[in-house]
Amino acid sequence: MTQSQRKILVTSALPYANGPIHLGHMLEYIQTDIWSRFQKMRGHECHYICADDAHGTPIMLKAQQLGIAPEAMIAQVQIEHEQDFADFNVAFDNFHSTHSEENRELASDIYIKLRDAGHIKTKTISQLYDPEKSMFLPDRFVKGTCPKCKSDDQYGDNCDSCGATYSTTDLINPRSAVSGATPVMKDTEHFFFDLPAFEGMLKEWIHSGSLQSEMANKLNEWFEQGLQQWDISRDAPYFGFEIPDAPGKYFYVWLDAPIGYMGSFKNFCAKRGDINFDDFWAKDSTAEVYHFIGKDIVYFHSLFWPAMLEGAGLRKPTSVYAHGYVTVNGAKMSKSKGTFIKARTYLDHLDPEYLRYYYAAKLSSRIDDLDLNLEDFAQRVNSDLVGKLVNLASRTAGFISKRFDGKLANVTDNSLAESFIAKQEVIAEFYEAREYGKAMREIMAMADIANGFVAEQAPWQLVKDDDKQAQAHEVCSIALNLFRILTTYLKPVLPRLSQDVEAFMQLELTWDNLAKDMTAHEIAPFKAMMQRVDLDKVAAMVDASKDNLQPTEAPKADKKADKKVEKKATTGDPLTDDPISDEISFEDFAKLDLRIALIAKAEHVADADKLLKLQLDLGGVTKQVFAGIKSAYAPEDLEGKLTVMVANLAPRKMRFGMSEGMVLAAGPGGDELWILEPHQGAKPGMRVK
């Protein structure tokens, strides 16, 4: 190899430690793993690092629901995550947790450097306070008697019994749900990172080639609106790291999450003993650092993270690579349809190599969504991997073993193999640029040529003629050498198959030995390497992924149950199920002020089954909206998206807080809801006409 060795650190976004991995997550880990494996095949020093993102309110609340400590929950989730990744052949060099001493030390050190440099500001906000427990109380921790219907044990701003909303001060006999004490209002100080101070650096960095062009252009909107200071603190109770010199204040999860890359790498360095942490993270580092992420967390990694690193005197990433979402059969993953498929459910039914190849065949360097069409999935895997690749060996290997003592021939014409080897730099460039789909097409085009050669030469006919034994030997030897070259190119994508091929060919598949002379090379007897995708197993996987909507036994009579409204049966025709409403005047329509809004923040709402709390940025004006879309979206899938909102809807007080508008969504409900997303070019604050 003529190229010089590179020092590379590559990461995938940290999976959140409150639930299982699903096939949407797996896109990123497969994409990154392929890139990491390719770099190692090329002889570079490449370390693939990841960790569980193990802090935040959702984890704290879920642990409380389970009746266990958050530490116990995240430890169990980490075991499950690591097993799923291992079974998908995702080869991390280190997988750690953000809830680690390495991460605590690094987060504190970075914060102190930012603070001492004047990049941390403080602001005062007011919250409910428990004087006995000395803790600030979210609404869910204040209870009392409803001032309307006099029902006991109601939350501070909403009554579950009568549906009334009211001010916390109107609650009769208010008490802390933690201690029973009467709460008071008290000011609390929050800490903010001074992001605007880094505007010049960020503008230069995002247009330096470190980001995909569409990502860089999208981030321009943040500068047009004006960068805002970023709240990096949360009050107890909170599961995370306490802020230095600020008792009761905790780092917001998104501060220590990206530092988790560094924490895991520091843990890895300690395990290895021969890798210097500072060689990769110091300001003057010449190593390369790459983050693979989903498009929903671009602004955290491309604004906050590089600014934090700059302010702390550390190096910034070489590049941040974003990918799109996964849809299944052309639609958002759905539990009711069985297309919200967990990694473990997939592994219980199908070979992980299938999905690795299918994702690779559809991945590019762009931020496009990827559709896992299950019918196309089966057809493509069966055609490409079984029909073209493995079939090349299965049709020819038997003749070598049975008739020619398991040894390849001295080939007189190597032109076909030489033409395949000549493609190595083209394929390498595609892998390097994350254009995996182009690489797969190039490889399969060669597989077509190889199979065409075998079909034309028909060794099964040649072996019948005693005078053509040498020709049959040579044809089969050429075919197996082509099979070896093709599998070498596919090794980053298909590691398990590559191991089987290495055992069969009795040599290691490396980039350096692509041109190896295979004369008289001995092979092992051929064994079946890959089965066709069984559509019955695909159907069983989908069925196993469906929510069981039917109760296992008849429910007992319940007054509350009598009040529940059953979901209406639908025909599947939107206009039949939901006819067009009566006409309104243009004047009535003109009263609506529809605006483009950026979802700056999305959060779960404690004790709310359907609601997400959204902070919507209208280009200088921020509105808080409670949206009934929890069944269809996770908060992390929404942040950074543009949507459309009704901006002039009268504020409505809810038990969880004030809702100042409404986001627009389509669909019958449940997990079949889709928020409206404007095309690129639309900007927060623009009126929808």
UniProtKB/Swiss-Prot annotation:
Gene Ontology terms: cellular component: cytosol
Localization of this protein: Cytoplasm
EC number, as in UniProt: 6.1.1.10
Cofactor(s), names only, from the UniProt record: Zn(2+)
NAD keyword on record: no
UniProt-listed GO biological process terms: methionyl-tRNA aminoacylation
Catalysed reaction equations from the record: tRNA(Met) + L-methionine + ATP = L-methionyl-tRNA(Met) + AMP + diphosphate
Basic and acidic residues composition-biased segments: 555-570
Segments carrying motif 'HIGH' region: 15-25
Alphabetized InterPro entries for the sequence: aa-tRNA-synth_I_CS (IPR001412), Anticodon_Met (IPR041872), Met-tRNA-synth_bsu_C (IPR004495), Met-tRNA_ligase_1 (IPR023458), Met-tRNA_synth (IPR014758), Methionyl/Leucyl_tRNA_Synth (IPR015413), MetRS_core (IPR033911), MetRS_Zn (IPR029038)
Class of enzymatic activity (EC top level): ligase
Record: residues binding Zn(2+): 146, 149, 159, 162
UniProt binding sites for ATP: 335
Region annotated Disordered, chain positions: 546-577
SUPFAM superfamilies the UniProt entry points to: Anticodon-binding domain of a subclass of class I aminoacyl-tRNA synthetases, Methionyl-tRNA synthetase (MetRS), Zn-domain, Nucleic acid-binding proteins, Nucleotidylyl transferase
Primary role: Is required not only for elongation of protein synthesis but also for the initiation of all mRNA translation through initiator tRNA(fMet) aminoacylation.
NCBIfam families: metG, metG_C_term, PRK00133.1
Subunit structure: Homodimer.
PANTHER family for the chain: METHIONINE--TRNA LIGASE, METHIONINE--TRNA LIGASE, CYTOPLASMIC
Protein name: Methionine--tRNA ligase
Species in which this protein is naturally found: Shewanella denitrificans (strain OS217 / ATCC BAA-1090 / DSM 15013)
Name of encoding gene: metG
